[in-house]
Swiss-Prot record:
Organism encoding this protein: Paraburkholderia xenovorans (strain LB400)
Described purpose of this protein according to its UniProt entry: Binds directly to 23S ribosomal RNA and is necessary for the in vitro assembly process of the 50S ribosomal subunit. It is not involved in the protein synthesizing functions of that subunit.
Gene responsible for this protein: rplT
GO MF terms held by the record: rRNA binding; structural constituent of ribosome
Record's keyword terms, sorted: Ribonucleoprotein, Ribosomal protein, RNA-binding, rRNA-binding
The protein's name in its UniProt record: Large ribosomal subunit protein bL20
Amino acid sequence: MPRVKRGVTARARHKKIIKLAKGYRGRRNNVYRIAKQAVMRAGQYAYRDRRNKKRVFRALWITRINAAVRQHDMTYSVFINGLKKASIELDRKVLADMAVFDKAAFAAIVQQVKAAVAA
C-alpha cells in the first residue's frame, strides 16, 4: 500500500480557512493559524448576533410604535392592551412600518384602539 502524504489535504484545508478570512486586516487574512482563530471567532459572533438581531429589531419596532402612539396621547402599553381588546391582530413589525410610512392608516388603528379602551 502506498504511503499517503498529507500535503494535498492540508493545502485544501488551509485554502478553505484563508478564503473564509478574506477581507480581514493584518495577518488575519494570510497566516493560517491566526486566520483560523479569526474565522472561528467570527463564526461565534455571527451565531450570537443572529439571535440578538431578533431582540434588537423587536426593540426598534416597540420604540417606533411608542413614539407614534404618544403623538396620539396614548402610551405603548395601553395601545397594545387596546389592540388585544379590539382583536386587531397586527404584529409589531407591521405596526412600526405603518407608523413610519402610512401615518393615516396608523391613526385609524389608534382611533379603533381608543374606542376599544373606552368601552
